[in-house]
Amino acid sequence: MKDEDKTKIINAVTNLSTALKKYHPNTETCNYVEITLTELKKKDGKAFTGAFLYFLTKASMLRTSENVSLNDTESKLWHKMSALKNLGNDFFFGMGL
């Protein structure tokens, strides 16, 4: 993954985290996004890509199970962040898939 792609993802997760802290501060979803953001900042390469792709799945399931209803701002940020999953296409390179 290119450095600029990693930066886009970090910025998107940061923006979502900020919004969740404002509108849903005491939810597991908010806490998970914040913890994952800290972890993503420490990772590079395939470890970063794998962690981000896992995060997308788990965060979505957690949000659904908690019945967190996103407002318009959060929804736009969530979709913007989720759209970046295509940047993780390098994850399976060389695995014959």
Please name every model-derived segment.
Residues 1-30, 86-97:
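Short terminal alpha-helical segments
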Residues 2-5, 9, 41, 45-48, ...:
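Intrinsic-disorder-associated interaction segments
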Residues 8-15, 32-35, 39, 54, ...:
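Charged, amphipathic alpha-helical oligomerization/scaffolding segments
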Residues 20-63:
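Amphipathic alpha-helical interaction modules
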Residues 57-97:
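Amphipathic alpha-helical binding modules
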